[in-house]
Regions:
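Alpha-amylase-like alpha-glycosidases and glucanotransferases acting on alpha-linked glucans and related
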Residues: 1-20, 42-176
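Conserved, well-ordered alpha-helix/loop/beta-strand core segments that scaffold catalytic motifs
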Residues: 17-42
Length: 176
């Protein structure tokens, strides 16, 4: 239970933080400094997004990456994967709101694990190692056509990991 774990002061603390952050951001912006924020592709398995919007997440698979120059064995992250068909059916509204919320905090947004929008490493939910995964096509251009109609702020694509021509093409198509 969130309230019991975080305590009765957690919500006022969050409000105070948001107000103070707004002051810091305005101070920086007034001096020509833009704030760069980070938006990870995946959410936490035990996070509020997954619990508040279960239809947008798969329960049979989790995220990771295959062996690459960062890890010779690959990585089993364990984050829930998105049900991209469900997101598309809703016009990617959850994503649009997620990105808009990030832009209430930041001026520029770096999207982590960008390559997952072109293709991502899908592992069975009960996987013990990353070798059991496989590449699955991501939402690609359809997602960014919708997102960028709603959000005009600058987005930077993280380019770490196994960057294949389809990832580069997606990044370049939308000038990210």
């Amino acid at each position: 239970d969130w309230e019991r774990r975080e305590g009765p002061d957690a919500i006022p603390d969050q409000i105070r933080f948001e107000r103070r952050w707004g002051e810091v951001r305005r101070y920086a912006n007034d001096r020509g400094i833009r704030i760069l924020g980070d938006l990870p592709l995946y959410v936490a398995a035990d996070g509020v997004d997954r619990h508040a919007h279960p239809a947008f997440f798969r329960t049979d698979a989790v995220a990771g990456v295959p062996p690459d120059y960062f890890s010779e064995d690959g990585q089993l992250w364990g984050n829930p994967l998105y049900d991209w068909k469900a997101h598309k059916a809703e016009g990617y509204a959850w994503w649009v709101e997620r990105v808009k919320a990030a832009f209430r905090l930041y001026d520029i947004l770096r999207v982590g694990h960008f390559r997952g929008f072109a293709g991502y490493w899908r592992l069975p939910a009960k996987a013990k190692t990353p070798e059991t995964g496989r590449w699955v096509k991501g939402p690609g251009p359809d997602f960014f056509k919708t997102l960028l109609k709603a959000v005009a702020n600058p987005i930077i694509a993280e380019d770490l990991g196994d960057i294949t021509p389809d990832v580069t093409a997606l990044r370049d198509q939308f000038k990210l």
